Amino acid sequence: MESQQLSQNSPNLHGSAYASVTSKEVPSNQDPLAVSASNLPEFDRDSTKVNSQQETTPGTSAVPENHHHVSPQPASVPPPQNGQYQQHGMMTPNKAMASNWAHYQQPSMMTCSHYQTSPAYYQPDPHYPLPQYIPPLSTSSPDPIDLKNQHSEIPQAKTKVGNNVLPPHTLTSEENFSTWVKFYIRFLKNSNLGDIIPNDQGEIKRQMTYEEHAYIYNTFQAFAPFHLLPTWVKQILEINYADILTVLCKSVSKMQTNNQELKDWIALANLEYDGSTSADTFEITVSTIIQRLKENNINVSDRLACQLILKGLSGDFKYLRNQYRTKTNMKLSQLFAEIQLIYDENKIMNLNKPSQYKQHSEYKNVSRTSPNTTNTKVTTRNYQRTNSSKPRAAKAHNIATSSKFSRVNNDHINESTVSSQYLSDDNELSLGQQQKESKPTHTIDSNDELPDHLLIDSGASQTLVRSAHYLHHATPNSEINIVDAQKQDIPINAIGNLHFNFQNGTKTSIKALHTPNIAYDLLSLSELANQNITACFTRNTLERSDGTVLAPIVKHGDFYWLSKKYLIPSHISKLTINNVNKSKSVNKYPYPLIHRMLGHANFRSIQKSLKKNAVTYLKESDIEWSNASTYQCPDCLIGKSTKHRHVKGSRLKYQESYEPFQYLHTDIFGPVHHLPKSAPSYFISFTDEKTRFQWVYPLHDRREESILNVFTSILAFIKNQFNARVLVIQMDRGSEYTNKTLHKFFTNRGITACYTTTADSRAHGVAERLNRTLLNDCRTLLHCSGLPNHLWFSAVEFSTIIRNSLVSPKNDKSARQHAGLAGLDITTILPFGQPVIVNNHNPDSKIHPRGIPGYALHPSRNSYGYIIYLPSLKKTVDTTNYVILQDKQSKLDQFNYDTLTFDDDLNRLTAHNQSFIEKNETEQSYDQNTESDHDYQSEIEINSDPLVNDFSSQSINPLQLDKEPVQKVRAPKEVDADISEYNILPSTIRSRTPHIINKESTEMGGTIESDTTSPRHSSTFTARNQKRPGSPNDMIDLTSQDRVNYGLENIKTTRLGGTEEPYIQRNSDTNIKYRTTNSTPSIDDRSSNSESTTPIISIETKAACDNTPSIDTDPPEYRSSDHATPNIMPDKSSKNVTADSILDDLPLPDLTNKSPTDTSDVSKDIPHIHSRQTNSSLGGMDDSNVLTTTKSKKRSLEDNETEIEVSRDTWNNKNMRSLEPPRSKKRINLIAAIKGVKSIKPVRTTLRYDEAITYNEDNKEKDRYIEAYHKEINQLLRMNTWDTNKYYDRNDIDPKKVINSMFIFNKKRDGTHKARFVARGDIQHPDTYDSDMQSNTVHHYALMTSLSIALDNDYYITQLDISSAYLYADIKEELYIRPPPHLGLNDKLLRLRKSLYGLKQSGANWYETIKSYLINCCDMQEVRGWSCVFKNSQVTICLFVDDMILFSKDLNANKKIITTLKKQYDTKIINLGEGDNEIQYDILGLEIKYQRSKYMKLGMEKSLTEKLPKLNVPLNPKGKKLRAPGQPGHYIDQDELEIDEDEYKEKVHEMQKLIGLASYVGYKFRFDLLYYINTLAQHILFPSRQVLDMTYELIQFMWDTRDKQLIWHKNKPTKPDNKLVAISDASYGNQPYYKSQIGNIFLLNGKVIGGKSTKASLTCTSTTEAEIHAVSEAIPLLNNLSHLVQELNKKPIIKGLLTDSRSTISIIKSTNEEKFRNRFFGTKAMRLRDEVSGNNLYVYYIETKKNIADVMTKPLPIKTFKLLTNKWIH
């Protein structure tokens, strides 16, 4: 009803469409775009001009009074939500009806018709002209406005009269729409509607009411005819005819953009910089301007930007103009770097430069005196021409007589006065419209000089000449200082007079200064005025005061000049002037002399060094710097000659004009050695420049004929196949290309041979890179397929086919597509080395097999067949008759994870790859009657360490009875660094020693007996691939010459590959005579079960042991006496350092047994022989490495024997898989399995927003997460994390710069709920961060060292936390993130200001920020080589992201640092550390109990109690606890793993969780677990049942010993020195592929601070080499820790190294430099000698039984493990 009434009572809709809102006065000259844009000064002029053109009635000059125009009473309805008008209330629709304002109805009540057919639309015409003034909207009028009778004349300068508002003029054309919008916006502002007008970003101050919407809608229709609107406006109105605000918003945005472009150009053209602000600020300002112009599609080139910047440089920066004046390729970044360098130099100089006070006597009246200086400054004011033709300097007549010519200001050079011209029109844009006062630049060269003339300068106070030829009565300068316009010193060599002889014979003389460091000879008018001579610039003459003309002056350029012909020469040579100078105290040294004295250093380095007083007794002013910057030293040019730099992409400009296949690159690779004659040794490659199409051709040699044949073939192929002619071939200068034959070939065919310059291989990058790519592919394909090396070219050819078919990163098409060829048909390609069966069409017999196994190589060039290699025939065939073998591989891929290292995240595992032993390897013979410096090699393990008698130089057969057969043992293959070494399954272990079958065995039908004694350790925790003991496959392959019958029984043997060999003779158990070992067995062997009563090995005498020869070929001088204890004496002071002093206070085991050196009863040291334990709890894993005898089945377990406790029910089960129902199994492709592992996501311990809040059913937890969420939001806003002033549209931002964000929620260890707003850095584009920046945290060794020093020195330990640390670091890159979810702005973006958590660069930004603050504000210094360790004289700080640990003797020093930190950062004190009682800390996951002056205990009991049960490992909390993490005698079977793919990924995932946690704990403080962790980590990708069980056992042991702690006690206060010791150990060959395990433990003042267990990266051939490798790994870290300790604690330090290898100590001690056994061995040994002697390192021997590093290299029996660890962890 209301809407109908409104429509019925509004007959005069068109008559009141021009009413406006009246409010307080708005100035008529207010800019209509004041909300969003800057004021335009021409707006008011345009407004007045337009308004004056409107039709007016001449008879009136003001608006007639209208008594109806009275203000209504405020409406009784409530005001709108967004506020009222400033003076009046709003009307309801009913009141609007009563006052005839119904036409301002709600837009929703209007008829929804087209724009021009709307009932509110009114088109003015001549009969109904537009009103001159409009009553306000809030003014009630009883009668509607009569448009027909309102014809008042409008005053031109008024926009409002009384309560009326001047309406805008009517739009007259589409082109004037932007100008019309300005007036319309002003009209709305004057109507008090400015706060609802959107700015260029679409923002408004309040929402409009319905009446206001109708008002704007109607007025816009009235003054903007639809047919005159621009197209984009019509498109908006056609969608929504009432959407006027969108039109205004886009109009304002367009005007704002145009206005901003204008401002940016003006700002860029008027850049000025003198160093008053920082260079960074200047760079940011300029870059911002250029970026805004670029966003508006205006690209400013680097050259233009550099020119504009150079134009505005002044002061010390002005010299850059000359530097860049001749450069054509100017880079903006380089210029900014130069500016930054000068700014930094000036900043440092200003801090260090003392104030100078110089007094002048003779010329004191010439310069103005100031409190700080009395320097005479040359002023060069040159008058500028105005618009008239007369120069401004024409008033020079008055200079001599007028007081205007004063020297009061002559000591200051006028700066360039710049008056920027305002642009008169929006469309006018002229760069450089400036008026500058011209002046010469005196200290740089100029091209404007008029030769043989003096420049007349009315502003110069002194006359300066560059040549002493005209200087009379010259005297050396001693007190005058001259500066130029840039306030740079001008050195003055001499002072004298210039004598003039003018036209009429008039002679005069003026004073002048001689300096060669100016661009012009300057003639001062003030000096001439003193002689009553003036310059008349109207007549261009020099005149006397009486008008007599003395000489003409010449105008050249902008200046006036006087010829030097009027000067009288002095007849004094320049040498004379220099001699005068040298005779005085002001003697300047020539720069070439100083250049030679200072080692031919460059100019800038010398000058900067003198400025900073780096060289004493020589000042910068003492040197003659003239022409120093351009001085060319011949010796430097010769000695420092370098190659020219290759600019990336520079080659392209020379080759753009070539078409496909016209420009080729070629190169030859080879030779490849050790190949059959039939295999090629070289290949030659060709690459087309345009298409990057590649060809390769095999070569057997590099003769001219071979190369010529290839070129003939390639040219013919290109000509016929691509209809192209080769024009240029680029190649290097090898003799195969530069010979006469090939040169003649090119000449006859008109081909240009383009050679590289001498020794410039980088210019041949295309061909070189192709060869590198092909060879990388070749090595990969051969290694993956396992094919022999002589097929290397087939791999290269296969790679070429594939590379031609793939799109390279720099091209959008493949080479084949560029060449116009079809894409590669994938159905015609097989994997390189794919096993196939080839049909034999011509068998030898009809009953012979028709199929031959082979391996696919590559598609044939000459047919539609495939090239296939047939190993049995040793040839390749081209055929299509083949069948692919499914699920077969050319070889078993082997992956061998090497060293387990720990990064800061403690989750990554790294591995090194190892090569495998091929069948065609060479075999190396070893004599079984000899021994090496290690124990004899057994079936699996080669004994780790020698103890005694391993240095004997005698070689006597210990048995004297029978000669034992010589065994052939395969030596490890030399590792090829280019072949991938990743292996999952360790392959068959090397050849094993023979075994003897004992028929009395109770378990397997016979006991396996070795022909050697038991090694020092009976077994190892390693991997093998072998059958169960007792089977014939356990026997190794012996060559025919080994099969000698010595009364041995026949035993059937088998090769490793499975081929049966004839029976060979072995020793029977009735006539065995074994030799004895030459080393004392280890602890676990000596303490073997004493119940064994049937030994089968006869023990020889000690003499035989001592005289046993060794395989080790160390020269005799490397061996020492058995009873000697060698040590290294680094210097003379070492006499005070003994082995006892090094060993003192170390947590070594207490031994009651005899020393290993006590050999009085050798038989007591020989261990009893164990029987085999095949019924182990891990499923009967065999121990084929030990010697066995029959033993009682029932006997009690003791601590020294193997013990496996059950921690999971499945561990007790036997291998019952055969009883399970059959299930579907799938053989895993191991390569694919690795890819699958990479896709496995880590365990997620956090919650997403929907999980924590949206769908969280736990209301209590949900409320806590909501509270944490709002706390995080408030913190982000408080830190100004993003720009809150503007939201960006997603479509307007480059997607690379958009970073996804998310909230993560978790519950901290202390029970608090945490919310964190993070960026998805894992999907961050590489272009948005600098990959060179690194995020540093304190190294764990540094933290442990600091804690140890704190205990010994009674330090207070304070723990701090900085809230939202990353948010304090600014971000340099332009990045955007999505707003938080509560804002509901899904399509908007926020620009980041701070380093948000999760960004790649956030950690590095925070590190640089806090580092700078600690150094500059806290007076800290970072310890060199140890990031995040800071110290000063009182406090040491360890920084781990936002956690800080403070150490200090004085607690007040810590508090002082805390106070300083709180000034900048929100710093929380977690634990102040005051008090003398026990204090508990939680530092980076370590639970620390600290009582000053007494002890420190480090553990993780609470954390492990919480985390271990969550690993889904069935722990056995009530059962018997395990007493060791693993036991010797258990091997990881390496049978082929058959498992479902999903189950495989699940188990790998489980292994990652378990080993990841174990790694974290071991790295922190459980160093005794590192060996087991490292070994299991190597099998993460081989999650067999056995590996999982061993991992469960490790986790169970961690659970049982979770309360163990690393115990430290305070060092004895009587010891003045710090003692840093490394204990080293190695276990030779106990890892797959002959690898050795090495380990080190580091101790500071008797406290274990770190440990390392890793597999040796190189293959060692003896125990000595393994020990040397272990020692060489320990020394670098030992030296680094030594530096850290000395920085943190100034006490002297003693460095010691302990090893149980006497041979290693002997080699280090020896001075013999004869050739070593191999290169690696010798290099390591020589390096150790240098490091030990050069670092004051003491090396001593430690008994093996006391070597606690043993736990790092091998599994130990329980008793031994406890003995070695109970002193330092319990």
Curated annotation (Swiss-Prot):
Initially, virus-like particles (VLPs) are composed of the structural unprocessed proteins Gag and Gag-Pol, and also contain the host initiator methionine tRNA (tRNA(i)-Met) which serves as a primer for minus-strand DNA synthesis, and a dimer of genomic Ty RNA. Processing of the polyproteins occurs within the particle and proceeds by an ordered pathway, called maturation. The keyword Nucleotide-binding applies. Signal peptide: none annotated. Residues 656-831 form the Integrase catalytic domain. Mg(2+) 2 binds at D1361, D1442, D1443. Residues 1353-1491 form the Reverse transcriptase Ty1/copia-type domain. The record marks H397, N398, N578, N579, A1232, A1233 as: Cleavage. PANTHER family: TRANSPOSASE, PUTATIVE-RELATED (PTHR42648), TRANSPOSON TY4-P GAG-POL POLYPROTEIN (PTHR42648:SF11). This is Transposon Ty2-DR1 Gag-Pol polyprotein. The lineage of its organism: Eukaryota, Fungi, Dikarya, Ascomycota, Saccharomycotina.
